[in-house]
Amino acid sequence: MNPLGYVPALVLDDGTLLTEGAAIVQYIADQVPSKKLAPPNGTIERARLQAWLNFCSSEIHKGGFSPLFYKGIPEEGKNVFRARLVARFIYLNEHLKSNEYLMGHDYSVADAHLFVVSNWASWVKFDLSPYTNVVSYRGRIGTRAAVRSAMEAEGLIPWPSAQPQ
């Protein structure tokens, strides 16, 4: 489906293919603006949302967790990415000390995106427990009815804890 050979990909009713998680979640949020999962286009808040989505995609996903899944990368190389993740989670932990969600007090698609990506920590044995604000944040998101419903539908319940397995 995705010509690049990876997920996610969304095929719209008219056959249009949309790829990349950040683009997909913004598109979905824009279809139901009354849910307020994304600030209105053209606002500074929307730019901040895009900044968080880019941070999740580039710093946590592609530049952090993804290389840890590749068997061909030696441990010394993987340690570079683990160190990057430590720095990024320290940053997130500090931000979440005074913010309920990435955008402050309002849940957004950036939170959904980070929740999914941060679930990979247990699969690559990256311990999130030192980042207590991140762990609390993940708990808040993981107990949301829509999140639990989606995770049950995908067979992901129980969702990974903060501890590596």
Q: Which residue ranges define each predicted feature?
A:
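GST superfamily/GST-like fold recognition
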Residues: 64-65, 102-130, 135-143, 151
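Charged/polar positions within long, soluble alpha-helices
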Residues: 65, 94-97, 146, 152
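Terminal-tail/helix-coil boundary detector
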Residues: 150-165
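Hydrophobic alpha-helical bundle segments that form small-molecule/ligand-binding pockets
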Residues: 89-103
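GST-like domain detector, emphasizing the conserved glutathione-binding G-site
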Residues: 1-89, 93
